[in-house]
């Protein structure tokens, strides 16, 4: 038994017919084109994963930086409230 209920002999006959129809040069060029397309697809996936990792690292860095200085942020918020409160009384 072969693949999906197709015997090995049936697969060989189909392959011989394909070779006769397209020829080896055409099949070789199709294989090369298909290989190039797969390689390009893998490269684009790798680039996308790299970009996602860089974005995640940037976000983590920003969050860590914000977490390091909460007292400075609170002081800046307090200063802003004082300044904006003084502007209202003028």
Curated annotation (Swiss-Prot):
Q: What is its main location?
A: membrane
Region (Disordered) location: 45-90
Which residue windows does the record flag with biased composition (Basic and acidic residues)? 45-68, 76-90
TM spans, by residue?
Answer: 2-22
Which UniProt keywords are given for this protein, alphabetically ordered? Cell inner membrane, Cell membrane, Membrane, Protein transport, Translocation, Transmembrane, Transmembrane helix, Transport
State the oligomer form and interacting partners: The Tat system comprises two distinct complexes: a TatABC complex, containing multiple copies of TatA, TatB and TatC subunits, and a separate TatA complex, containing only TatA subunits. Substrates initially bind to the TatABC complex, which probably triggers association of the separate TatA complex to form the active translocon.
| Name of the protein in its database record | Sec-independent protein translocase protein TatA
Q: Which organism is it from?
A: Nitrosococcus oceani (strain ATCC 19707 / BCRC 17464 / JCM 30415 / NCIMB 11848 / C-107)
């Amino acid at each position: 038994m072969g693949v999906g209920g197709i015997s090995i002999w049936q697969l060989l006959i189909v392959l011989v017919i394909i070779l006769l129809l397209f020829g080896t040069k055409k099949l070789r060029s199709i294989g090369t084109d298909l290989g190039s397309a797969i390689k390009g697809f893998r490269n684009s996936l790798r680039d996308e994963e790299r970009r996602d990792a860089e974005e995640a690292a940037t976000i983590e860095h920003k969050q860590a930086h914000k977490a390091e200085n909460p007292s400075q942020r609170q002081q800046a918020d307090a200063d802003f409230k004082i300044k904006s409160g003084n502007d209202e009384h003028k």
